[in-house]
Amino acid sequence: MASKLETLKANLEAAFGGLLQSTTEAIGELTIVVKAGDYLNVATRLRDDRSLGFEQCVDLCGVDYQTYADGAYDGPRFAAVLHLLSVQNNWRLRLRVFAPDDEVPILPSVVEIWNSVNWYEREAFDLYGIVFEGHPDLRRILTDYGFIGHPFRKDFPVSGYVEMRYDPEEKRVVYQPVTIEPREITPRVIREDRYGGLKH
């Protein structure tokens, strides 16, 4: 008798065949990778095909692979990863799709397929700059309206570009260039024979 994962894998291969770039198993779940051009077609069939039945998308997140594998990775930089759930079949699936352009990452929106991804796509846009074409309201959701850049990108500076403070003279919040100075952190070495009551 085939396991649930083997059954799911066989159903995926029967439904998609050559559309799947890869199928891997990790942590008791399958991950499939598809091209951006096939993304909408695959997502629709994942939901509508009764042998798959992924009626829920429980999460969508952006990923920046710029420094993946200590810089040895040379594939596309940005991806969206969806976590899908089939209640009727009691199985889960990860769907990964890479944006073909690293400079302006664009992927189709799947809001029309799973409306739960609305705010997830907005979050991935806000934090990674992934543009979801066809999204009904793609605007920032976590950062401030005038925020510059996308803070979860690997090349975004830790201190940011601007800081916000209240100006008592102007009686309003103002933005200014970051005034935090870069620091070198030097480890503190304690050279005491009996530090903390311990014998050495």
UniProtKB/Swiss-Prot annotation:
Keyword list, A-Z: Cell inner membrane, Cell membrane, Membrane, NAD, Quinone, Translocase, Transport, Ubiquinone
Domain of life (superkingdom): Bacteria
EC number: 7.1.1.-
Subcellular location: Cell inner membrane
One Gene Ontology term of the molecular function aspect: quinone binding
Matching PANTHER family: NADH DEHYDROGENASE [UBIQUINONE] IRON-SULFUR PROTEIN 3, MITOCHONDRIAL, NADH DEHYDROGENASE UBIQUINONE IRON-SULFUR PROTEIN 3
Record-given protein name: NADH-quinone oxidoreductase subunit C
